[in-house]
Amino acid sequence: MIARCFSAVRGLHRVGGSRILFKMTLGREVMSPLQAVSSYTAAGRNVLRWDLSPEQIKTRTEELIAQTKQVYDSVGMLDIKDVTYENCLQALADVEVKYIVERTMLDFPQHVSTDREVRAASTEADKRLSRFDIEMSMREDIFQRIVHLQETCDLEKIKPEARRYLEKSVKMGRRNGLHLPEEVQNEIKSMKKRMSELCIDFNKNLNEDDTFLVFSKAELGALPDDFIDSLEKMDDDKYKITLKYPHYFPVMKKCCIPETRRRMEMAFNTRCKEENTVILQQLLPLRAQVAKLLGYSTHADFVLEMNTAKSTSRVTAFLDDLSQKLKPLGEAEREFILSLKKKECEEKGFEYDGKINAWDLHYYMTQTEELKYSIDQEFIKEYFPIEVVTEGLLNIYQELLGLSFEQVADAHVWNPSVTLYTVKDKATGEVLGQFYLDLYPREGKYNHAACFGLQPGCLLPDGSRMLSVAALVVNFSQPVAGRPSLLRHDEVRTYFHEFGHVMHQICAQTDFARFSGTNVETDFVEVPSQMLENWVWDIDSLRRLSKHYKDGNPIADDLLEKLVASRLVNTGLLTLRQIVLSKVDQSLHTNSSLDAASEYARYCTDILGVAATPGTNMPATFGHLAGGYDGQYYGYLWSEVFSMDMFYSCFKKEGIMNPEVGMKYRNLILRPGGSLDGMDMLQNFLQREPNQKAFLMSRGLQAP
């Protein structure tokens, strides 16, 4: 997931729908109010601070708003006949950079700080700045000057990226309703502010959720001793199990006690049920109302206009077609799982109810993998200690993309467990950026996996380049005494995926902050990172990523072959679940009056063939709905069509560690950032139109 943390260019990872894009940008000629605080925008430096107190966050938020508004006012007061590219558009773009960097220091701590008061202050800063973003994005005086510039400027005399910036600025102004009557603009503005606050609160509720359950050792049947030993023991000799991933998934995949899994699944899918259900009931109609005022039939139509899919009809056709193609495979997988369940119930004396429950799915899919491919993830993870995986991952990315990474000693970070690396071009030694690795769970920390863009890699007013900075935030299991953090293979895949976003952020070299890094279409943003997941299914790459944590021995070749062969296990059900989530997202954003829990339950039954547990409301836990993927969750599957096409037609064909192909990928897919349309970048790389053949093969299906 890409957490879109640039206020001016983002939407999240991230938390994105909670961010309102900074649509209009700020300016050069009125830089004087900002000079005193702009030293950190010097080229080639990471100027981010993570030690701000709650009071400093509040004070700096108000200062940033005052300084930025002064710039807007200056641009807005330009006589319309005196507007030029330099004093209007370029000026706005220059000041935008300063705003982004300062805003990052104010609103990112809500996701990673160990101090609850800092997180609260950061959340409030995010709300305050999001309201301000909306105010500034709806300045009709700025919009009028940009429209005038487009009408009078000699577009042939400005660079293509600047021309794109101008066109996007006008487009965003219209999508904000600045061409509409003032009373309509005010109505839109008011609703947008409320939507922003609701999105921030939705994700804050999930981040701050500290629900836990207590089980006896007997109730944790079949879970490995190392997992049990890592748990906090309660006074009554029972164990504390949280709903964080490092606890939840091991229980759901390996615990043989159905009642334990039922309780966990019920708790997991009722997190923040009351408060987030209320938020969705307010948020979805507001989105629909804004879309209607702007002239769109639905919110989904509004957001899809800017994506590669373009229309809800194309998305619906894609999802329905894929669902039908996967239906026979899903049925076969369900039948096999039911046979496993029936056999186990008979052997262990459990009641057999003749159906697959939501709390059965992960458990029996894990058994399927073990039986069909002799893959035991608990055994395999002993070969994936996090230090070995990290070293192997960094080496593969360096070799593939022509880069070098150096860990920064005594780095300024937000937690002692966080590390910082500098990225250089291997051939020239040019510093391209830096990235943080934040790998372990903490109280109040963002509880999924995402890449946060923190500092844009773009040009500064003096023509020098700002250092691009990103943070990879995940939640792998903590090391315990005598045993390092060990990753399941699916966690290794997640690591590769999110680091792919990091490389996109670092390797992009754009003129404007708005186009930096991962600021591409939402249904294209996953393409680069998904493509790089293929490396964790390659035997040679897996050898570089693994070593037994005790004796350093490699994984046996026959086990590696089985692991790679297991790629297609459960692919029908896993993909159908993605279709369920995509359909729910589309439904809620085409008919806002629908009940989210009921809609999810309907699609679970109709498409997945596994009923949602009564009393749960999974959409209330679905951060993407309030995190920049609203109406766009289909993008994960849509992007895979492109990512698989790139991998099989180029890397698989010419060698996955072929440095020439790697540089072609870096230059044609990563380097442009959002300065080109995603489909144009893809066609430049493929030298043809993309097709679904490789994607269908990756799902165990035959291309037509």
Swiss-Prot record:
Q: Which cofactor does it need?
A: Zn(2+)
Q: What is its EC number?
A: 3.4.24.16
Question: Which residues does the record give as Zn(2+) binding sites?
Answer: 497, 501, 504
Question: Which Cys pairs are S-S linked?
Answer: none
Any keyword tRNA-binding?
no
The catalytic activity, as recorded, is:
Preferential cleavage in neurotensin: 10-Pro-|-Tyr-11
Q: Which residues form the active site?
A: 498
Q: Which CDD domains match?
A: M3A_TOP
**Coiled-coil boundaries:** none
Q: Where in the cell is it found?
A: Mitochondrion intermembrane space; Cytoplasm, Cytosol
GO BP term (any one): proteolysis
Q: What does the record note about the cofactor?
A: Binds 1 zinc ion per subunit.
Which Gene3D superfamilies does its entry note? Collagenase (Catalytic Domain) (3.40.390.10), Endopeptidase. Chain P, domain 1 (1.20.1050.40), Neurolysin, domain 3 (1.10.1370.10)
EC class, as a word, reads hydrolase
**What is the role of this chain?**
Hydrolyzes oligopeptides such as neurotensin, bradykinin and dynorphin A. Acts as a regulator of cannabinoid signaling pathway by mediating degradation of hemopressin, an antagonist peptide of the cannabinoid receptor CNR1.
Name-wise, this protein is Neurolysin, mitochondrial
Q: Which organism is it from?
A: Oryctolagus cuniculus
